[in-house]
Amino acid sequence: MKKIASVLALFVALLFGLLACSKGSSSGASGKLKVVTTNSILADITKNIAGDKIELHSIVPVGKDPHEYEPLPEDVKKTSQADLIFYNGINLETGGNAWFTKLVKNANKVENKDYFAVSEGVDVIYLEGQNQAGKEDPHAWLNLENGILYAKNIAKQLIAKDPKNKDFYEKNLAAYTEKLSKLDQKAKQAFKNIPEDKKMIVTSEGCFKYFSKAYGVPSAYIWEINTEEEGTPEQIKTLVEKLRQTKVPALFVESSVDERPMKTVAKDTNIPIYAKIFTDSIAKEGEKGDSYYSMMKWNLDKIAEGLSQ
């Protein structure tokens, strides 16, 4: 019944969006490109490149999980009107309930013409769990080098759709990627100084594989990806037994997940939760971590601090 209601809501909202489209051109009265991103991280990267040259709508709200989402009528309307749509790809919005696949199909949008995966060119890491083996791990942005790649892919499509602002986009891209690159180099140096027997990042979801590869910090987790069961007794037991064989000084919990399973791990191992960190979303505006750059800086700083205890 819930699924039927969701489909009906999507259909009605799409009709409303198409009717709204018929009242004007897709670029709107402002003449600016209408751009849609699937989540707050992609929205922030896009804003850093496009500035005020576009009208931007981000679908999944700040703090919400982009793996499985039910688009609202406004999301359907904005998607149907969009000149350009950016999504992460590699099993994020297209895994789980495949909400993005349904959304663009119903909006009659065409891949690599209307919507683009910003992860194109990423060296993909694959999941390993019993029910997930062989599927792509979507969390590529947690390696800053991939964040730079995302920015370049976004700029490429903005320029293709809006060539008159090419110089503006390229200038912003250069400044932004230089900023990200400096943070990346700083992080690589910081993690070199942590003793090997303390060097492990422990989180609820196993979303730090790209981070681990980039910064040389092994990872452990309760569950592998948010589209599977989360925080079962067996998952918790497995992690607790693993941690008892280590000298890991700190645990971390993501801002967009239920923290109760990690609290159980902390209690059973006597290892404290050092900080909340960001994975699938930036923070609310005005809070620490409210941009891609600041969320990554927060993560890198807090993880290095916690593992240095």
Swiss-Prot record:
Q: Which family does it belong to?
A: Belongs to the bacterial solute-binding protein 9 family. Lipoprotein receptor antigen (Lrai) subfamily.
Q: Which UniProt keywords apply?
A: Cell membrane, Lipoprotein, Manganese, Membrane, Metal-binding, Palmitate, Signal, Transport
Q: Does the keyword Transmembrane helix apply?
A: no
Q: What's the name of the protein?
A: Metal ABC transporter substrate-binding lipoprotein FimA
The leader peptide range reads: 1-20
List the GO biological process terms. Answer: cell adhesion; metal ion transport
List residues binding a divalent metal cation. Answer: H67, H139, E205, D280
Lipidation (N-palmitoyl cysteine) occurs at C21
GO molecular-function annotation terms? metal ion binding
Q: Which Pfam families match?
A: ZnuA (PF01297)
CDD domains listed in its UniProt record: PsaA
Q: Where in the cell is it found?
A: Cell membrane
Q: Which InterPro entries match?
A: AdhesinB, Bact_metal-bind_prot9, Lipoprotein_PsaA-like, ZnuA-like
**UniProt source species:** Streptococcus parasanguinis
Query: One Gene Ontology cellular component annotation?
Result: plasma membrane
Origin superkingdom: Bacteria
